[in-house]
Amino acid sequence: MKITGRNIKRRLYGLRTLPSKLKRARYFRGHGVHSPFVYSIVREVFMRSELNTERRELYDALMKINVAKRRAIQLQNLMEHCKYATFKIDCEPQQIKDCDMVIASIDIPAEELATLADKAREEQTTLCIMSPSLDHQRDKACQAIVEAHPCTSVDNHGYLLLFNNYLPKQKFRL
């Protein structure tokens, strides 16, 4: 007689990934992040679900290009937290000058991301790449950019932040 229904293997299937999910949740809250700058970003930006200030320019621009509301709120809060005044979305590498933050949406092909990252590094501008693991080609391009990046990078699965300032080379995957 064959036993049907949910056996013990099927009941415990979800527990296999539990340690990695708990680890990611801890990093999301800031545990294990030993950089004061990144820790403050985790606490003041990633863990907020509402806008911190009345400024909404970046939020409105991101909502127009169909970025998720949560990601738009986080990036607007990041702009306020880092005291950035100007931003550009999907600009050419030559247009990065005089800009604090550049956002590369999913409309930018993976082949052009490295050029954009190099120009952002030259101009000391923070680069935000939306959906870094959208497909295999974009994921590989973003991994290569992070490996070559001389400063701090933060990947929170929704976007990849490449800071080009005084911070040491650190890679965070939250």
What are these regions (language model features)?
Residues 1-123, 133-174:
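A short alpha-helical cap/connector motif
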Residues 127-130:
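Short beta-strand/loop segment that forms part of the nucleotide-sugar
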